[in-house]
Amino acid sequence: MMQKNTITVTSDKITQPLTFAFAADFHNGDADEALSLMRGCDAILIGGDLVNRHSRHGWRNAARFLNLAPRVAPTFYNLGNHERLLPDIAEYLPLVQKSDVTVLDDCFVDFRGITLGGVSSARKMPGMPPV
């Protein structure tokens, strides 16, 4: 079940109000339901685990989310452990690369004066190959 929560962050460093939608642990969930909760945001942040590492069954939902999310707002994706542990990650990554999402894998970007970054989950998991 998806739910919408609101957290307000204030800082003298933030010069304009921004609304971020954060999604994590989607695990092949319903793309349309998730995106309906995100309409009107300034950016979508994906914290990983769009897929379930044990099943290719829901990849279609993850691909739909990745293709539709950038139409709602600029989208930034940090791969989670479920993506990293996919036995066939080489087949999943092209789905990600075909979308207009920005992958944040041990890198940072500036978005309207806010630094967004992603840390590779592979760094914490010995033996994980870099993507």
Residue ranges and their predicted role:
Residues 4, 15, 39, 70-72, ...:
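Short, well-ordered coil/turn elements that cap or connect secondary structure elements
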Residues 40-46, 69-70, 80-87, 116-119:
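Generic detector of short, locally flexible boundary/turn motifs and exposed helical patches
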Residues 1-65:
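N-terminal active-site segment of His-dependent metallophosphoesterases
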Residues 11-13, 28-30, 51-52, 83-131:
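Conserved catalytic scaffold of divalent metal-dependent phosphoesterases
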Residues 61-72, 95:
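Catalytic-core regions built around general acid/base machinery
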Residues 21-24, 44-49, 74-81, 102-106:
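Active-site neighborhood of phospho(di)ester-bond hydrolases with catalytic His/Asp-centered motifs
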